[in-house]
């Protein structure tokens, strides 16, 4: 074991100048004062939520000066700043991460203990903010965390949703969606900035007319105004004085417009206006299976884009005092997928209509300012809006999009005369729809994918025609995760072991986790790592016992798949293997297998029938397995409801096996794979997304890869040759599983939608094709787990190589290659 004193010098000296409470006595004094002001009650009568909120306000007080100073320095030095637009930010709880960020967790813990509270019980009193749902939002959260940690001038921009996606409950084995009223007790981290409110226009009529000088100007009349009020959340840099901002917009009705409607006696119209406005920031991802839902989603997207851009332009003019023609030298705008793609026509609108710039100049500024990250390969997931709805809701924006499309198609047709198929493939407006991905590519100077295989598919297939036109715009930026959240905070036991082994400089420079490689075969280190994993499995087992009244064996393989429920992510492949394993045990009572605990988590979109049926299938099989005494000593199955960031912080550190089994070529990147890896789990996966790069980092011997490759999948799509009915006919195990879906043998239940997806619709995601390879991969997992020394070796290698997948690396690449921003020390 390395003597840490002789290892590379740790960095703790660099945090001496950050503001902090001097000791626990000062903490207790300030806590008491703040609590009396906030709650006006005896400390002994405070609830855990009140204790949490008190500490949150204390932290805000502590960082407020740095928050102000950070923004002052950016303006004084006229540094270029990036604004990261995302429809969601899945930030998770902030109390613990902020305490770690300001290096005050120990003082807070000790002070609370003296006052009679346990910090570990206070932390869960904070609700997970309902500001995001899946990987898109969690990536955005990790990115703004890294921006602040690296002291880069960057901020987030999104919507302050009153309700999150939904709280998931499992009732009678089925997902039930309940309101996620996460703001019910307020949110102490936010600061309402009424003076920064702006107005966003919807509807009305827009047309062009000549002005006094004969130039065309736009007239937009009879529109509805929505007041956008920002709520700012501090994003605290890790052990530095940088405090960036996540700005969240809330929609409010315009009092002037409401009074105007009431003054003409149209009360019904007035209240309809008021309700429609309040809906804009009420729900994350409203159901878009109907016209009203799609209309609301489009309103949400334009609302936060317009509000954010107006705020940015106003700040630029007020603080930078530079020509609007230099805007792109000082401002970078990044759009996280296509939800914020309306940034492009909205910036054009502001530059032309409000700043008086010509079309060509405005377009050049816009393209140089905006960059776009694509997150999807699935054609059905590419965002499109019907032209009539778009035109009615956003008439001025539609005129701009129409002009962008006309100019672009004129250029394409001049380069490729007579090639209408090419024009169709790259048009922004086509077949009655607005194609947002096409708009995003056209209006951005940079287009990136989020894993090497994903970026290559974009160039070769999904956006191939654009790549041939703008090859210089395309690049790859493999996703990353915040090691502060997913290792330091989520797994303090492992973080401490790493500190004791190689020093703590990896906390600042995660690539230094590679210094663990020499310890991969060190018996003493393996023993300590085993103890840490056992402790984390016991913590999760206690949670499962308390929440689900179910005991799980901590000496079993914890095999975990946690992600959004979708057919391409293939939770179905996992649960069919579990059913197959169950049948093997039932058919062979003397058969002994490596004990397993299979854990699932994730939400299905409320309107996605096959995904909801997948959840029902998992729960029915779980009940069947767990209640069978002849089987449940060797395997358990659980679906953990309401998966979120906080639950993830319990699951990732406890995992032995990371299930990353999407159909090859369908997952853009994935970041759960990185979180598992960083906590020492072994990847069981396809060659998809970032799995490809994880495999390259750790090698065949330290992960288990199976299944079709992306080119094989694409070949089947293009040329055919795959028949799921043939798989059914040729494989008795598959036939038994498919029949069980509809013959009532699984808990007396029927799963017709999944049966139809596998057989009647020819198994679009190749679950049956990959079934036997997956079973063999699971056997390989069991074999490797049986050799404890080799398993520990693989676990150490995964941890050591995971530093590459820190979002700090990703963000540094964005900063250097796309945004051209520099760190600002202070």
Model segments located where?
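A conserved ligand/cofactor-binding region detector
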Residues: 2-826
């Amino acid at each position: 074991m390395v003597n840490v004193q002789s290892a590379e010098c740790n960095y703790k000296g660099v945090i001496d100048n950050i503001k902090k409470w001097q000791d626990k006595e000062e903490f207790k004094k300030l806590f008491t004062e703040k609590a009396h002001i906030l709650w006006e009650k005896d400390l002994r009568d405070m609830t855990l939520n009140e204790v949490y909120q008190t500490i949150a306000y204390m932290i805000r007080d502590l960082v407020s000066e740095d928050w102000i100073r950070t923004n002052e320095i950016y303006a004084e030095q006229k540094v270029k700043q990036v604004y990261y637009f995302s429809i969601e930010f899945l930030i998770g709880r902030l109390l613990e991460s902020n305490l770690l960020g300001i290096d005050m967790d120990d003082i807070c813990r000790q002070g609370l203990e003296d006052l009679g509270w346990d910090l570990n019980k206070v932390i869960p009193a904070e609700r997970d903010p309902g500001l995001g749902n899946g990987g898109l939002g969690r990536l955005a959260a990790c990115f703004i965390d890294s921006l602040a940690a690296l002291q880069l001038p960057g901020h987030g921009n999104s919507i302050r949703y009153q309700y999150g996606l939904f709280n998931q409950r499992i009732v009678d084995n089925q997902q039930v969606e309940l309101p996620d009223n996460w703001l019910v007790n307020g949110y102490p981290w936010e600061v309402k900035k009424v003076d920064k409110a702006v107005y966003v226009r919807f509807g009305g009529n827009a047309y062009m007319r000549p002005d006094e000088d004969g130039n065309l100007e736009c007239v937009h009349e009879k529109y509805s105004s929505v007041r956008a009020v920002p709520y700012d959340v501090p994003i605290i840099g890790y052990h530095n004085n940088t405090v960036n901002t996540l700005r969240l917009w809330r929609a409010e009705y315009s009092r002037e417009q409401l009074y105007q409607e009431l003054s003409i006696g149209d009360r019904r119209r007035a209240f309809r206006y008021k309700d429609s406005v309040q809906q804009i920031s009420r729900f994350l991802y409203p159901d878009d299976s109907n016209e009203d839902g799609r209309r609301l989603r489009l309103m949400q997207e334009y609302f936060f884009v317009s509000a954010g851009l107006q705020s940015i332009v106003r700040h630029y003019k007020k603080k930078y005092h530079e020509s609007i023609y230099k805007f792109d030298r000082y401002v970078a705008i990044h759009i996280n997928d296509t939800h914020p793609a309306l940034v492009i026509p909205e910036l054009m609108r502001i530059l032309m209509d409000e700043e008086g710039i010509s079309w060509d100049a405005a377009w050049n500024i816009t393209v140089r300012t905006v960059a776009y990250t694509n997150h999807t390969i699935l054609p059905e997931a590419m965002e499109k809006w019907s032209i009539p709805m778009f035109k009615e809701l956003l008439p001025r924006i539609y005129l701009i999009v129409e002009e962008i499309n006309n100019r672009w198609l004129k250029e394409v047709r001049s380069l490729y005369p007579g090639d209408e198929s090419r024009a169709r493939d790259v048009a922004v407006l086509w077949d009655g729809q607005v194609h947002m991905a096409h708009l995003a590519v056209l209006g951005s100077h940079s287009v990136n994918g989020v894993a090497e295989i994903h970026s290559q598919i974009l160039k070769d297939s999904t956006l191939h025609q654009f790549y041939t036109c703008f090859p210089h715009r395309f690049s790859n930026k493999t996703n990353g995760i915040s090691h502060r959240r997913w290792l330091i905070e989520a797994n303090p036991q492992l973080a401490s072991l790493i500190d004791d082994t190689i020093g703590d400089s990896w906390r600042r420079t995660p690539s230094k986790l590679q210094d663990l490689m020499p310890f991969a075969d060190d018996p003493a280190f393996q023993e300590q790592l085993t103890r840490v994993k056992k402790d984390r499995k016991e913590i999760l087992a206690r949670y499962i016992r308390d929440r689900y009244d179910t005991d799980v064996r901590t000496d079993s393989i914890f095999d975990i798949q946690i992600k959004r429920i979708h057919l391409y992510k293939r939770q179905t492949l996992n649960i069919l293997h579990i059913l197959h394993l169950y049948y093997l045990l039932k058919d062979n009572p003397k058969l002994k297998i490596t004990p397993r605990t299979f854990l699932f988590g994730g939400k299905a979109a409320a309107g996605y029938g096959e995904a909801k049926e997948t959840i029902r299938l998992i729960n029915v099989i779980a009940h069947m397995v767990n209640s069978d005494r002849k089987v449940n000593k060797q395997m358990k199955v659980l679906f953990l409801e309401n998966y979120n960031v906080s639950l993830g912080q319990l699951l990732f550190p406890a995992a032995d096996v990371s299930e990353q089994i999407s159909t090859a070529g369908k997952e853009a990147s994935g970041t759960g794979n990185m979180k598992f890896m960083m906590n020492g789990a072994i990847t069981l996966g396809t060659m998809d997304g970032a799995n490809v790069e994880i495999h390259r980092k750790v090698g065949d011997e330290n992960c288990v890869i199976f299944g079709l490759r992306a080119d094989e999948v694409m070949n089947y799509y293009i040329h055919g040759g795959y028949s799921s009915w043939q798989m059914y006919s040729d494989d008795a195990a598959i036939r038994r599983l498919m029949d069980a879906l509809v013959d009532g043998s699984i808990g007396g239940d029927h799963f017709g939608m999944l049966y139809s997806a596998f057989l009647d619709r020819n198994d679009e995601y190749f679950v049956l094709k990959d079934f036997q390879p997956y079973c063999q991969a699971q056997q390989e997992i069991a074999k490797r787990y049986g050799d404890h020394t080799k398993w520990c070796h693989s676990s150490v290698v995964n941890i050591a190589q995971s530093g590459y997948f820190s979002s700090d690396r990703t963000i540094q690449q964005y900063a250097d290659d796309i945004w051209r921003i520099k760190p600002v020390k202070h």
